[in-house]
């Protein structure tokens, strides 16, 4: 579920300079506090030796116990970055290349998660219906409804407005869910459709996929770090959002799967042509080989 910037991780060419993590950091219900043993088992024992910054996002499985605990892991884990539930970092890749990393918390923006129907949002599934075999009862729903998705959208629009509009800087947006699933506020029309957003990376679906929304092929699923499952694309998706008067308005976004592969793997993103192009490659981790790529120009 990790996306790597600038280089191949396993191949040994051009080692990466940073990692973008699309969420679900600690299965099944997240961590209880900063002393939770899962931190060592699922992260530090596996990745702490990589020696590069990790820009982390929250997934739905991080919402069961304490999402806030992950915001302070930087105090004990070198390289762990999660400034807030959603945040922006401006990163100098080189003297001439700047990348704006906008990390969203898409979880409170999925309308199914805000309902009272537990079957739509239980992060532990049928095996652990309330997470009690692991630790304590799941607090997923109360954690979700405590967040304001509309406020996050206004924040994201403000961040984008602060970035130069001359395409001199790259903008990478990271979220846990596929673009069409972020439906309790209109992130698609009001934010992601903006041409200043060059790439959107998500996890959640446990596969690799390149897809387009509203004709823009700048979207990818890089959720194949583990528990690989079958994923599907869609030709169109209709989303309904209640307005402030309780009425529902219909939004239709054309979603098309361009390429997908059900395989354990990751993506790499390499700056080329003097920083004017980024090549995204999808990697089969078992074969240690690139299986698909596409280019985006600034």
Kindly give the residue locations of the regions a language model identified.
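Short acidic, glycine-rich surface-loop motifs adjacent to enzyme active sites
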Residues: 160-181
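Short, solvent-exposed aromatic-acidic interface loops
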Residues: 281-291
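N-terminal active-site segment of His-dependent metallophosphoesterases
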Residues: 1-35
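Hydrophobic residues embedded in beta-strands of well-ordered beta-sheets
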Residues: 276-280
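Histidine-centered catalytic micro-motifs
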Residues: 173-180, 200-208
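Conserved acidic residues
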Residues: 17-19, 169-171, 198
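Extended active-site neighborhood of metal-dependent phosphoesterases/phosphodiesterases
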Residues: 27-165, 187-199, 205-270
């Amino acid at each position: 579920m990790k996306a790597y910037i600038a280089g191949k991780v396993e191949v040994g060419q051009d080692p990466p300079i940073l990692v973008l993590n699309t969420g679900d950091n600690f299965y099944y219900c997240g961590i209880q506090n900063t002393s939770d043993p899962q931190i060592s088992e699922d992260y530090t024992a596996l990745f702490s030796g990589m020696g590069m910054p990790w820009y982390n996002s929250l997934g739905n499985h991080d919402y069961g116990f304490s999402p806030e605990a992950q915001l302070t892991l930087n105090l004990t884990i070198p390289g762990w970055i999660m400034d807030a539930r959603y945040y922006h970092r401006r990163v100098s890749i080189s003297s001439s290349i700047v990348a704006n990393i906008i990390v969203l918390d898409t979880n409170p923006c999925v309308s199914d998660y805000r309902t009272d129907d537990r079957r739509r949002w239980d992060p532990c599934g049928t095996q652990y219906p309330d997470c009690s075999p692991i630790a304590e009862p799941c607090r997923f729903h109360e954690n979700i409804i405590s967040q304001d998705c509309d406020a996050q959208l206004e924040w994201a629009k403000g961040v984008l407005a602060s970035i130069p509009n001359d395409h001199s800087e790259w903008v990478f947006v990271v979220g846990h869910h596929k673009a069409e699933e972020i439906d309790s506020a209109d992130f698609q029309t009001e934010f992601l459709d903006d041409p200043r957003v060059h790439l959107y990376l998500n996890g959640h679906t446990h596969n690799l996929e390149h897809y387009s929304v509203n004709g823009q092929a700048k979207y990818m699923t890089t959720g194949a770090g583990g528990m690989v499952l079958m994923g599907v694309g869609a030709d169109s998706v209709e989303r309904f959002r209640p307005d402030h008067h309780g009425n529902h308005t219909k939004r239709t976004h054309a979603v098309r799967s361009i390429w997908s592969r059900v395989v354990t793997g990751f993506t790499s993103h390499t700056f080329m042509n003097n920083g004017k192009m980024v090549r995204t490659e999808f990697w089969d981790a078992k074969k240690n080989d690139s299986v698909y790529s596409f280019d985006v120009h600034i």
